[in-house]
Structures are given as structure tokens and as C-alpha cells.
């Protein structure tokens, strides 16, 4: 475990450029050590890939564009420099992406389920987050978190994950900024209208948490991050709850909503 942790630290510190969906938190602050128990690190030999969300002891939710070969998942991490005794590392056993996802459109159905090679144990720093029971309403207060950039135009990354409070905004706000935005049922528009708080590079795949439930998955947004009226776009998890539950139940041929 110590060797794996050392390697993971080296990889995470080798942060390289990735699209906005893998971003860091802009305008946030260091998360409390116990408030991100469901946050997962995805990494491979090149470094940090993305974040994810533990939704039960055997399954992780992340973005489809985070898919890569030979990655591992790290649970219970707070500081890259200080080991938590309950940190756990797992390999993916199976990966599920919507079979009806448009292959030439990275933004379409940007959701992936990962089954772990063995279950993780709940602990002081590890616990799953609930799937949504209903979609969030416009104006809902939400929380984002991750190890992404903290300054939009610089490769500045934190030792511990940063958190920020943002709001669900009307879909029309994002539609005005992004002509290629998917329909309302598939995505959530979230951020601060005047800018200053946003997800950024290497936050991709991480959770948008509203009312204690994972309502969104960090997908994409404006460049640089955190600009006025250029909000973050998140996969709408509620739209995919039936698919998620079907896959977990063993129906691996389940299809996502069109």
C-alpha cells in the first residue's frame, strides 16, 4: 500500500494539460478533510486523469471522456503529501459507457460507470454518495470539489482538494454561451453568473453535489475557467438513474435515454 501511495503521489504531481472537464476548482478553498469521502482519484502512468464519485462499495461514477487504459482508482485521499491510514486503491473490473453514445461527440452522454475489482470499505475518509431522487431546481445551492487548477491561466494545483459553492442556473444561460449545448434533460448548467467560481482542468468526472446527492458530473465548460456567463456544464445524473441502477443490478445490456 505504501509503494502504491508513493507511486500515486508521483503520478498526481505530474499533472499535464487536459480539457476543461478535468479541471481544478477556481475560486474555492481547501475542502474539510471529512467532506469529500466519496471523492475518487483516477490515475495512470501519465498522472492524474480525472475524479469520480463512489456511489456504493463496488461502483464509481465518472465522465465517459475520462476513460483510459490501465488506470487505477484511489479512495480516501486528502493530502498528496500526508497519507491517510484508510486510503485504498482498486483496479476497474468493468467499465460501462452508454451503448447509444455518439462515438464522434465527446460531450454526448458523458457518463461512465466503473465496477471495482473488489469492494472498498467505509471508513473515516471513505463513504458513498447517494444518487439523486429528483432533479435539482434552478437556484439550488451545490458543491463542487477536486484537485484541478486553482488559477485559470496557470498550472497551479492544490495539495488537498478544493471546494466551492455554486448554483444551478437556467439552461438558457448556458445555451446563450454555448451553441453546441445538449438538450436540457442531458445536462445541468451551474456556476456563478458573474464568474470567479468554477471547475477547471483535472476536475473532470467529479461530482456536483446538491442536497447531499450527486446531481451532476463535471463535463466541460468555458476557457479560461471561471469567466462571467461562461458556466460549467455537467452531465445530469438524474437523467441516467434508471440506466445506472440497471447496470448495477446486472442488466449490462441496458441502454441510456436517447
Curated annotation (Swiss-Prot):
Name of a matching Pfam family: Trypsin
Asked if the record carries the keyword Calcium, the reply is no
Q: Domain Peptidase S1, which positions? A: 25-249
UniProt keyword list: Disulfide bond, Glycoprotein, Hemostasis impairing toxin, Hydrolase, Protease, Secreted, Serine protease, Signal, Toxin, Zymogen
Q: Which GO terms describe its cellular component?
A: extracellular region; secretory granule
The entry's note on the tissues where this protein occurs is:
Expressed by the venom gland.
Q: Which residues are glycosylated?
A: 44, 239
Which positions correspond to the propeptide? 19-24
Q: Which GO terms describe its biological process?
A: proteolysis
Q: Which cysteines are joined by disulfide bonds?
A: 31-163, 50-66, 98-256, 142-210, 174-189, 200-225
Entry annotation: catalytic residues: 65, 110, 204
Q: Which InterPro entries match?
A: Peptidase_S1_PA, Peptidase_S1_PA_chymotrypsin, Peptidase_S1A, Trypsin_dom, TRYPSIN_HIS
Question: Which locations, inside or outside the cell, does it occupy?
Answer: Secreted
Q: Which GO terms describe its molecular function?
A: serine-type endopeptidase activity; toxin activity
| Signal peptide range | 1-18
Q: Which PROSITE patterns match?
A: TRYPSIN_DOM (PS50240), TRYPSIN_HIS (PS00134)
- The record's EC number reads 3.4.21.-
Q: Does the keyword Glycoprotein apply?
A: yes
Q: What does this protein do?
A: Snake venom serine protease that may act in the hemostasis system of the prey.
Which protein family is named in the record? Belongs to the peptidase S1 family. Snake venom subfamily.
Per UniProt, subunit arrangement is: Monomer.
Q: What is this protein called?
A: Snake venom serine protease 3
Amino acid at each position: 500500500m505504501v509503494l502504491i501511495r508513493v507511486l500515486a503521489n508521483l503520478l498526481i504531481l505530474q499533472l499535464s494539460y487536459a480539457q476543461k472537464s478535468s479541471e481544478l476548482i477556481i475560486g474555492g478553498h481547501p475542502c474539510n478533510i471529512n467532506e469529500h469521502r466519496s471523492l475518487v482519484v483516477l490515475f495512470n502512468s501519465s498522472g492524474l486523469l480525472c475524479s469520480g464519485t463512489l456511489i456504493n462499495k463496488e461502483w464509481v461514477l465518472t465522465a465517459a471522456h475520462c476513460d483510459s487504459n490501465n488506470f487505477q482508482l484511489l479512495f480516501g485521499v486528502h493530502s498528496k503529501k500526508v497519507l491517510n491510514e484508510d486510503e485504498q486503491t482498486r483496479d476497474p473490473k468493468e467499465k460501462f459507457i452508454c451503448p447509444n453514445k455518439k462515438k464522434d461527440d465527446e460531450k454526448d452522454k458523458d457518463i461512465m460507470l466503473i465496477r471495482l475489482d473488489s469492494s472498498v470499505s467505509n471508513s473515516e475518509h471513505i463513504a458513498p454518495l447517494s444518487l439523486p431522487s429528483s432533479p435539482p431546481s434552478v437556484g439550488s445551492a451545490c458543491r463542487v470539489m477536486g484537485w484541478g487548477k486553482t488559477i485559470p491561466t496557470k498550472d497551479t494545483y492544490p495539495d488537498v482538494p478544493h471546494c466551492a459553492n455554486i448554483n444551478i442556473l437556467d439552461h438558457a444561460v448556458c445555451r446563450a454561451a454555448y451553441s453546441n449545448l445538449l438538450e436540457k434533460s442531458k445536462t445541468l448548467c451551474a456556476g456563478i453568473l458573474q464568474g470567479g467560481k468554477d471547475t477547471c482542468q483535472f476536475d473532470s468526472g467529479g461530482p456536483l453535489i446538491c442536497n447531499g446527492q450527486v446531481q451532476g458530473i463535471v463535463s466541460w465548460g468555458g476557457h479560461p475557467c471561471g469567466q462571467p456567463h461562461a458556466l460549467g456544464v455537467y452531465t445530469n445524473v438524474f437523467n441516467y438513474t434508471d440506466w445506472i441502477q440497471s447496470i448495477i443490478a446486472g442488466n449490462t445490456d441496458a441502454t441510456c435515454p436517447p
